[in-house]
């Protein structure tokens, strides 16, 4: 159970999660995405990563046996993410102050995009940005 009260805006949480995912992809998977964007929706965090495939994976996905190649890439990437899952969950829990209930992922070998979805045990506490007042 996460007990520390985290006081961040929704935008801060989304930015920190995007940075943590990029760091994980670079350090654990060996290559970072071109772009990562996290979205906090109640008790769900959705991360969209662009351009995650390596040049070798792209060649494999475009080979004459591309169906087999694409399935191999998907299985490999899902297996690697599952092995690194404790690291990812720990990073997310530290940022949001809420436990991760489940993690789901998929990757497109056609577009090179990956989506990661975290389901949390509860919505994180989010502070509202103070409204700017006119002078």
Identify the function of each model-found stretch:
Residues 2-135:
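Interaction-mediating elements
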């Amino acid at each position: 159970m996460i007990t520390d009260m985290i006081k961040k805006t929704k935008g801060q949480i989304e930015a920190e999660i995007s940075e943590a995912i990029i760091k994980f992809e670079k350090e654990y998977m060996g290559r970072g995405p071109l772009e990562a964007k996290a979205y906090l929706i109640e008790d769900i965090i959705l991360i969209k990563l662009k351009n995650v495939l390596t040049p070798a994976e792209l060649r494999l996905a475009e080979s004459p046996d591309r169906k087999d190649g694409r399935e191999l890439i998907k299985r490999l990437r899902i297996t690697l993410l599952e092995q690194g899952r404790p690291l990812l969950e720990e990073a997310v829990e530290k940022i949001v102050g809420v436990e991760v209930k489940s993690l789901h992922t998929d990757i497109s070998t056609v577009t090179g995009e990956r989506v990661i979805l975290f389901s949390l045990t509860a919505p994180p506490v989010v502070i509202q940005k103070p409204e700017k007042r006119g002078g």
